[in-house]
Amino acid sequence: MQALLEHFITQSTVYSLMAVVLVAFLESLALVGLILPGTVLMAGLGALIGSGELSFWHAWLAGIIGCLMGDWISFWLGWRFKKPLHRWSFLKKNKALLDKTEHALHQHSMFTILVGRFVGPTRPLVPMVAGMLDLPVAKFITPNIIGCLLWPPFYFLPGILAGAAIDIPAGMQSGEFKWLLLATAVFLWVGGWLCWRLWRSGKATDRLSHYLSRGRLLWLTPLISAIGVVALVVLIRHPLMPVYIDILRKVVGV
C-alpha cells in the first residue's frame, strides 16, 4: 500500500492528493477504519510532506475532505440501517465497545464526537453510532467539523517530523540528532500514554492492568515523563536544531 501511494505521488500531484482523500475517507468510514492501518498510512503520507514531495496545505485540505466524507456517510449508514446493524454478528461480538460508545454519546455527545475522532477504536464507530441513535444533525455537525479540521495535521505530524529529519544534511552530528529526536518522541509519547493509563487506572480492566497497576504507574509515569522532558531540552539545545526548524518552516510554508 505504501509503495503504491509513493508511485502515485511521483506521477502526479493530483494522484497524491487523491491518495490522501482516499486514506482519510477509508480511515473514517464505518467499521472499515477498524481494519485499515490508517495511522501508519497517514504517517507515511506525513513523511512525504516532511520531505517536500507533497504540499502540507493541500494535503491538509484533502484530509479534511476525506474525513468529512467518511464521517457523514457513516452517520447516514447508521441512521438508515440502524435495525439491521444492531442484529449484525460483527457488532454483537463488539457489543461492549458499542455500548460504551452509545453511553458516551448519550452523556456527552459533542465531546464524544470530537475526542472520538482521535481515538483509534472509536474513530470509525462514533459517527455510525450517532446515526443509529438518531442524534440531531445540529449536535453532530459542529464537533465533527472541528475534529476533521484538526485530525489530518495531528496524524501527519509523526511522519512530517521524520521526513524533515531525513533532509538534514549529512554530517558528524546528524546521526546523533536523528537518534535524539527519535528517543525524545518515544519517551514523550510513552509518558503521555502512561499519564492516560494512570488517569484511567480505576476504570481499566484490560490485560495491561495486571502489569501496569496503579502503584507501579505512580512512579513509572513521572520517571518516563521526566526522561522525555530532559531529552526534549537536550534536543532543543542541539546545534542542528535551528537547521531542523528551518526545514519544518519550509514544509509548512512559513
UniProtKB/Swiss-Prot annotation:
Q: Does the keyword Cell inner membrane apply?
A: yes
Q: Which superkingdom is the protein from?
A: Bacteria
Entry keyword Cell membrane: yes
Cytoplasmic face: residue ranges? 80-144, 200-215
Q: Where in the cell is it found?
A: Cell inner membrane
- What is an example of a Pfam family matching this protein? VTT_dom
Q: Which residues cross the membrane?
A: 8-28, 29-49, 59-79, 145-165, 179-199, 216-236
All ranges on the Periplasmic side of the membrane = 1-7, 50-58, 166-178, 237-254
Keywords on this record? Answer: Cell inner membrane, Cell membrane, Membrane, Transmembrane, Transmembrane helix
Q: How is this protein situated with respect to the membrane?
A: Multi-pass membrane protein
Q: What does the entry list under GO cellular component?
A: plasma membrane
Gene Ontology annotations of biological process type? FtsZ-dependent cytokinesis; response to ionizing radiation
The UniProt entry's sequence similarity note says: Belongs to the DedA family.
Q: What is this protein called?
A: Inner membrane protein YabI
Whose protein is this, by species? Escherichia coli (strain K12)
